[in-house]
Every structure is written in structure tokens, then in C-alpha cells.
């Protein structure tokens, strides 16, 4: 019994929004059971557009609900401030990291 209780306390639920192809509202679903949201654009030659504003709105929802947020990658076609960036695969992760928008609340939960 104590093992089962301890194991349940360690389970983390993540929501993966990748590829993020449109603006979404996860606010109604973010709770104590959801501890992380991961978002990113699509890779590959047929990749569809991901917009930075969608990423930021998802991040804001996480901020308001104290849920960890990880911007994993921009994807191949990324729109920021109205400009379309065509990014080679090797830059998807580093460009997302440079945005500096990840959130980490786990120690507070």
C-alpha cells in the first residue's frame, strides 16, 4: 500500500502540442493533474506553419495555471512578428531555446 501511494505521487501528466498547427485553449483542462505542456512546430519538407503568437498564448495559459511549459522547437516554417522564417532542422530546437519562454513550477507544486 505505501509503495502504491508513493508511486502515484510521482506520476506526471504532460500534454504534448506538437505540431502546434492552430491556436488552442487548454485552460479548462489545466489542473493539478497536468504538470507540463510541451509545444512546438512541425518539421519536414511538407511542414505546416506554426505561429509564435500561438506558442505565447499557450504559455500564458500555463503561467496562469502554474503549469510547466516547454517550447521544444520552432518547426520548419515559423511565423514571428508577421515574418515567415524557413528554418533548417538543425536550428529548430536552438531557436526555441533562444526565445527564453520556458516555465518551470514543479518545485512549487
Regions from the PLM with identified roles:
Residues 1-11:
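Single conserved hydrophobic/aromatic residue that forms the stacking wall/gate
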Residues 5, 15-26:
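Canonical radical SAM enzyme core domain
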Residues 12-14, 35-36:
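Conserved active-site beta-strand-loop modules that form the wall/rim of enzyme catalytic pockets
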Residues 21, 25-109:
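Auxiliary Fe-S-binding modules of radical SAM enzymes
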Amino acid at each position: 500500500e505505501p509503495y502504491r501511494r508513493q508511486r502515484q505521487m510521482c506520476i506526471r501528466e504532460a500534454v504534448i502540442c506538437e505540431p502546434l498547427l492552430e491556436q488552442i485553449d487548454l485552460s479548462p483542462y489545466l489542473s493539478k493533474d497536468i504538470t507540463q505542456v510541451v509545444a512546438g512546430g512541425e518539421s519536414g519538407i511538407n511542414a505546416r506553419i506554426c505561429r509564435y503568437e500561438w506558442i505565447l498564448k499557450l504559455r500564458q495559459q500555463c503561467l496562469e495555471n502554474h503549469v510547466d511549459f516547454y517550447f521544444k522547437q520552432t518547426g520548419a516554417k515559423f511565423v514571428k512578428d508577421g515574418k515567415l522564417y524557413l528554418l533548417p532542422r538543425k536550428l529548430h530546437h536552438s531557436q526555441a531555446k533562444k526565445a527564453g519562454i520556458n516555465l518551470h513550477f514543479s518545485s512549487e507544486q
